UniProtKB/Swiss-Prot annotation:
PANTHER family, sorted: DNA TRANSLOCASE FTSK, SPORULATION PROTEIN RELATED
Topology in membrane: Multi-pass membrane protein
Compartments, record wording: Cell membrane
Protein name per UniProt: DNA translocase FtsK
GN (gene name): ftsK
Complex formation: Homohexamer. Forms a ring that surrounds DNA.
Organism field: Streptomyces avermitilis (strain ATCC 31267 / DSM 46492 / JCM 5070 / NBRC 14893 / NCIMB 12804 / NRRL 8165 / MA-4680)
Region (Disordered): 1-55, 263-321, 372-403
Length: 905
């Protein structure tokens, strides 16, 4: 009703024109207003006239469609050719460029050396002769030389930029001088005059100089530019010009070779070399048949003379990569006399040692080393050249080469000379594979899995190891890593392998790693690892070979830096092979004066092959009780070493030994002690579980003390077990053994005990392991090295032939007189001894007295009284009265010895 009020009031405004019956016509007036709006719209908008049909429009559209179709077809054809060109081998591309340059050289030679007719000849004359002038005859020779270089050295593209810059400077300088020598014709003299001089290049180089400076300064500047180009092309620095000229003169026969004048110096050097030998150095045992000492000496001298020697003022060749000698010199200068072993090098030295290749033939000269401080010398070796890498694989490690036999021997006490075993005693493995058809099939399977589950990810590469291959997967934008880890079972199903391990992410890379076992596994030989360049350059006696990682690189570790190692794995996982590799590595690299060993083998069959080697400080221990006593001796030895370090003011055994060798350690006056360097002491326990079952308290206490304190004393511990449970590898042992090596385990719980993280339960056994060194966040997957029984026997026999073992008698002393402490005493041994001493000395057996004197509670005092009653020290209880004391005061020492488990005095 309220909405109709305005409509009812509008008609009265029109009542002046309509005097009567206006209210009755209100409804028709509204209808008329509604009808007028459509009439106005029809009148306002009229349809536009349609254009007349164009007869040429269809033809135009047809022609346009045909043109676009042809253009797309031609573009697709050329794009296909371009994609095919991208797939060509890089060597074919370089050969194609070289052949193109040869063809161009032939065309230019035909146009410049002969009167070639036709448009090609005119083009050559216009371009080549017009640009190079009188020297156009040398252009085809220059092109041919460049083409031959591309053919002979296709693997050195990094020098192309240098050669282009040098040739440009050389050509510009020479043509500028030719232009000035021919009178410096200008453009007004005509193009023919410029062609008869240095061409357009010579005119462009010489005209600005002659215009601004004149000929007097222009010619020297162009000569300097020419010399600069020549030095750049030949890669010769200015300070090496005399050396290069001397070498060129020697090759041409113009200059006398300075090396021939050193013959007299060789003879004098030979005398010094003979005098440097130890006077008492001789072979142990009878000499082999056919051995001629004088002949061998002359042969060695002739070989030494045949090595290239530098004169005093001769500088090293600057047109070669740095070799190991240069790196060592730079490292020594950077460290300024610091001890390299036992501390990490500076970042400068670390960067300096990266990417070093040795390209020298022969050996470098070394200064004779006194026999008392001689070490096994590792001569330099060649690194194998790296072959071409397939599409998805990473660069394989350099292959190992033969190392020359060690010629230097380490002098021991007296007249004994100990020679290290040769690496020829260890077998050599075959070259490792970098790619196989199985890897390509796995890449295709992974790509199909990602496509089926609509995951934006792609396999960008893989690195093949001896046991597993790690495939690198890069994720697309906004793709969660959890989408890859959730597909673990699907990936295992696709590649038909249950042992799939996913690493998210790969350390140091923005990629997810998928480790899948190889169907064609490879064996890693111990000899291949020890022949590695790093092993040859590092003479530390505690460097041991472990195996080969998933990226194809060899894994070695220094036991002195670990400083203790826990090795664990189920039966058949490769634990025993790892222990054999550790012991064999030490025997091959260290003498008995460098490293002594204590071997504990409760199983009695694993380490018996090493019985009798001179590195042993005691016979192999098979009795668990004697093993506990040996560990106690190691603790005492550690304390004695620390006493010496504290007395003479040294913090590490290496510094103490170095001071002894240099004669810096002085004994007090009147002391009859003879100081000698302490060897490293390596304790290897093959089965920790057996020791923990027999004497858990003594073994754990000794191991904890050794692992906590023995690093600076040069004592290192290797613990191995096939039952890595919490009652064997306790929390105290784990906390003090930072380096772990886990082989295949039977459960996730065992993996967490060893590594504190999962992963070992997914290993496939037979040497497949996870190595977690001290300070690393994630373990490295590796294939453990393998050494055969024949190899071990050969190395052991060589060591036995050198010298007999010298055992110490105090390692397991007292095991027959000493007995175990009674279990009912527990941790109350000290309190029980104090209580017995108090009761016997006072002859008064009262529980309340024990409470007051020992400050213990009633329960503890009553327990001590019961323990003394069971050992016949006091009599039975008589109510509130004091107990009778059954032991006299003069028998107290014997009672205390029995309580402590010692023999009665």
């Amino acid at each position: 009703m309220a909405s109709r009020q305005p409509a009812a009031k509008k008609p009265p405004a029109k009542k002046a024109a309509v005097p009567t019956k206006a209210p009755a016509k209100k409804a028709p007036a509204k209808k008329a207003a509604v009808r007028k709006a459509p009439a106005r719209k029809v009148a306002a908008k009229k349809p536009a006239p349609k254009p007349a049909p164009n007869p040429t429009g269809g033809v135009y559209k047809l022609a346009r469609a045909l043109w676009l179709g042809v253009a797309h077809a031609v573009g697709a054809m050329f794009r296909g050719i371009g994609q095919g060109a991208k797939g060509l081998d890089p060597a074919h591309r370089k050969d194609g460029l070289a052949l193109l340059l040869l063809g161009l050289a032939l065309i230019v030679a035909a146009g410049t050396w002969s009167n070639l007719r036709g448009p090609v000849g005119d083009l050559v004359e216009m371009l080549v002769t017009g640009a190079f002038g009188r020297l156009d005859l040398l252009v085809p020779i220059l092109l041919a030389v460049i083409a031959v270089r591309f053919i002979r050295h296709p693997e050195k593209p990094e020098a192309n930029g240098r050669i282009v810059i040098g040739l440009s400077a050389l050509v510009i300088g020479v043509l500028g001088q030719v232009h000035i020598a021919c009178g410096a014709p200008a453009r007004s003299d005509g193009m023919q005059a410029i062609r008869d001089a240095g061409g357009l290049i010579g005119w462009s180089a010489a005209t600005p100089l002659t215009y601004t400076m004149g000929d007097v300064l222009a010619v020297p500047l162009l000569v300097l530019l020419t010399v600069f180009g020549l030095l750049v092309v030949t890669a010769t620095p200015v300070n090496a010009i005399p050396q290069r000229l001397r070498l060129l003169g020697v090759r041409l026969g113009v200059v006398h070779d300075a090396q021939e004048g050193l013959a007299e110096d060789d003879e004098r050097y030979d005398e010094q070399w003979r005098e440097a030998l130890p006077p008492n150095a001789r072979r142990r045992g009878p000499a082999p048949a056919g051995y001629d000492p004088d002949g061998d000496e002359q042969e060695a001298l002739s070989k030494r003379r045949s090595r290239p020697r530098r004169s005093a003022g001769q500088q090293p060749d600057l047109n070669r990569p740095m070799d190991a000698v240069d790196v060592a010199a730079a490292a020594a200068a950077a460290l300024d006399g610091a001890v390299l072993h036992g501390m990490p090098p500076s970042p400068l030295v670390a960067d300096l040692t990266q990417g070093v290749t040795v390209e020298r033939d022969g050996y470098e000269e070394t200064t004779p080393v006194p026999a008392a401080r001689a070490k096994a010398v590792k001569p330099p070796r060649k690194e194998a050249s790296k072959a071409g890498v397939p599409d998805l694989t990473k660069a394989p490690p350099a292959e190992t080469r033969d190392l020359p036999a060690r010629a230097e021997q380490l002098q021991l006490s007296g007249d004994i000379t100990y020679s290290l075993p040769s690496l020829d005693l260890l077998e050599r493995g075959g070259p490792g594979k970098t790619r196989s058809a199985a890897n390509d099939a796995v890449v295709a399977s992974l790509s199909n899995v990602f496509m089926e589950f609509k995951v934006d990810a792609a396999v960008t590469g893989f690195t093949r190891g001896p046991t597993v291959t790690r495939y690198e997967v890069e994720l697309g934008p906004a793709v969660k890593v959890e989408r890859i880890t959730a597909l673990t079972k699907n990936i295992a199903y696709a590649v038909a392998s249950p042992d799939v391990r996913i690493i998210s992410p790969i350390p140091g890379k923005s990629a997810v790693g998928i480790e899948i076992p190889n169907t064609d596994r490879e064996m890693v030989n111990l000899g291949d690892v020890l022949r590695l360049a790093d092993a040859a350059e590092d003479d530390h006696p505690m460097l041991v070979a472990l195996g080969k990682d998933v990226e194809g690189g060899y894994v070695m570790a220094n036991l002195a830096k670990m400083p203790h190692l826990l090795v664990a794995g189920a039966t058949g996982s490769g634990k025993s092979s790892c222990i054999n590799c550790l012991i064999t590595s030490v025997m091959v690299r260290a003498t008995p004066e460098d490293v002594r060993m204590v071997l504990v083998d409760p199983k009695r069959v694993e380490l018996t092959a090493y019985e009798g080697i001179p590195h042993l400080i005691t016979p192999i221990i098979t009795n668990p009780k004697r093993a506990a006593e040996a560990l106690q001796w190691v603790v005492r030895e550690m304390d004695l070493r620390y006493d010496d370090l504290a007395a003479f003011g040294y913090r590490h055994i290496d510094d103490f030994n170095e001071a002894i060798r240099n004669g810096k350690v002085k004994l007090p006056e009147g002391s009859e002690r003879e100081l000698s360097p302490y060897p490293y002491l390596l304790v290897i326990v093959d089965e920790l579980a057996d020791l923990m079952m027999v004497a858990p308290r003594d073994v754990e206490d000794a191991i904890v003390r050794i692992t906590q304190l023995a690093r600076a004393a040069g004592i290192h511990l290797v613990l191995a077990t096939q039952r890595p449970s919490v009652d064997v590898v306790t929390g105290l042992i784990k906390a003090n053994v930072p380096s772990r090596l886990a082989f295949a385990t039977s459960s996730l719980a065992d993996s967490r005990v060893i590594l504190d993280q999962p992963g070992a339960e997914k290993l496939i056994g037979k040497g497949d392991g996870l190595f977690l060194p001290m300070g690393a966040n994630k373990p490295t997957r590796m294939q453990g090295a393998f050494v055969t029984e024949d190899e071990v026997e050969a190395v052991v026999q060589h060591c036995k032939d050198q010298m007999a073992p010298v055992f110490r008698d105090d390692v397991t002393v007292g095991t027959k007189q000493k007995k175990e402490i009674d279990e009912d005493i527990g941790d109350d041994l000290d309190l029980l001894c104090q209580a017995a001493e108090l009761v016997v000395s006072t002859q008064f057996g009262s529980t309340s007295m024990l409470q007051r004197k020992l400050r213990v509670g009633f329960a503890k005092a009553g327990r001590l009284m019961d323990l003394m009653e069971s050992r016949n020290i006091v009599g039975p209880s008589e109510g509130s009265k004091a107990r009778d004391v059954l032991v006299k005061a003069d028998e107290l020492d014997g009672v205390l010895a029995v309580i402590r488990g010692e023999a009665a005095p």
